């Protein structure tokens, strides 16, 4: 298992709230919690920035992390990430914050310690461009949105 440096910024982690962990051996994401001081109501259409109480330093340029929404929050409550996805570069060392957007028509209350997002580590390839006049032909070619059909 890859070792990643994690800094605890909120002293409630490890006492009141657990360190981020994988729920099962097959889990891809670690749950991130709302480390707020008191419950926070997110009004319909509002976006808020919520601290997670941690920072990570990935260090390995072949890795990055992404902050992704939790499916239940979006499907059941209309709570999604304000920036749709958060990208954490390997050299970033600051606090992990979660932008929550209430896309529903009802207020939603985030409780202290609620699991609000998940953190997934992903491989990174930095590309070097090769300038060409033409691409090698493929069956798809320039076919874009909807090109491959519905069924």
From Swiss-Prot:
PANTHER family: DEOXYURIDINE 5'-TRIPHOSPHATE NUCLEOTIDOHYDROLASE (PTHR11241:SF0). GO terms for biological process: dUMP biosynthetic process; dUTP catabolic process. This is Deoxyuridine 5'-triphosphate nucleotidohydrolase. Its EC number is 3.6.1.23. Pfam families: dUTPase. Disulfide bonds: none annotated. Pathway: Pyrimidine metabolism; dUMP biosynthesis; dUMP from dCTP (dUTP route): step 2/2. Substrate binds at residues 70-72, 83, 87-89, 97. Belongs to the dUTPase family. The keyword Cell membrane does not apply. GO terms for molecular function: dUTP diphosphatase activity; magnesium ion binding.
